[in-house]
Amino acid sequence: GNKAVRYGTTRNQVYSVEVVLPNGKIATFGSTLKKCSTGFCLDQLIIGSEGTLGIITKATLKLVPLSPFHVDVLAVFTKLSDAAEAVPKIVKAGINPTSVEFMDVSFVRSACEYCKLDLPHKEDGYYDIITIEAFNEAELDEKTEKLMKICEECHATDVVEADDRVWSVRRNCLESTRTYSKVGTSEDLVVPVTKIADCIKTLMEESKKYDFRPFCLAHAGDGNIHFQILKCDMSDEDWETQLEQFRAVAYPYVYSLGGRLSGEHGIGLKRLKYMEKYTDPVELEFMKTIKQAVDPNWIMNPGKVIEP
């Protein structure tokens, strides 16, 4: 989610998991110890397996206290390149942001219309939404000042405090696209944060070659990019053909940047054939070896992530 920049993903918040294994045995992997180097890290293996190695029946989670001071900032840019290039600068500025979200102008426009909200530059603005947390007011002021300076250096048109309206637009952006097309797909690409500007610019430019309608938003602070691609009035045949043509360009490019197919949604069924195609053969073979050893009958969540 959008706070992974500061707090990490769900896997970083799990102490241990209780699991029903394919052989029917019940085991607990992990512990509440602050550190443990006793054997394999099986809890993380289970967490990352999408249910293909066992069924999680219980999880012990960490609780992290909220910081007493925080501010949400909306930085508006009139150029995609400026908004995207600001992201790695914000992440590396030493302000430890809680979230850095990006919305392209198409999403800003559609979500504002859907929510019936009038936000700055809703017709021509690219949004970076940044949350900063601190333990005292002086620290918050210092971080905010640094953030404002970075945004101004990156040619932000407006930098204002974000209110609930901004987050309402962000939360409803995916739902808002249903007014344009009931059929679409969402990519879940992830690249190093230092490469996110190049990735967004390149793939948005590539998408102009096709008849589908592209939208882009990102959990930009951790390099996770969602391309929402809408079918609109395309024929079924053209839709399938052009979608595959786009992916044939996008996926190798993402991997060339050190990225991967999925940052948070997982492989499941949707990305299964691409997992086979783009994953390093040695890595893929290792996964299949683990699966075969733990679940020789392939009964756990069959047909997902990897195939026999």
What are these regions (language model features)?
Residues 51, 227, 295:
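Conserved, mostly hydrophobic/aromatic
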Residues 1-101:
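FAD-binding subdomain of flavoenzyme oxidoreductases
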Residues 65, 76-249, 253, 257:
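C-terminal substrate-recognition/cap domain of FAD-linked oxidoreductases
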Residues 15-35, 197-201, 234-245, 275-278:
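A short, flexible low-complexity segment enriched in Lys/Arg and Gly/Pro that occurs
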Residues 106, 220-223, 261, 266-273:
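Small/polar glycine-rich anion-binding or flexible loop at a beta-alpha turn
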Residues 26-47, 205-208, 244-258, 288:
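Short, hydrophobic/aliphatic alpha-helical segments
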Residues 25, 272-308:
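Activity-critical C-terminal alpha-helical subdomain
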Residues 248, 255-267, 292, 296-300:
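Alpha-helix capping/hinge segments and adjacent helical runs
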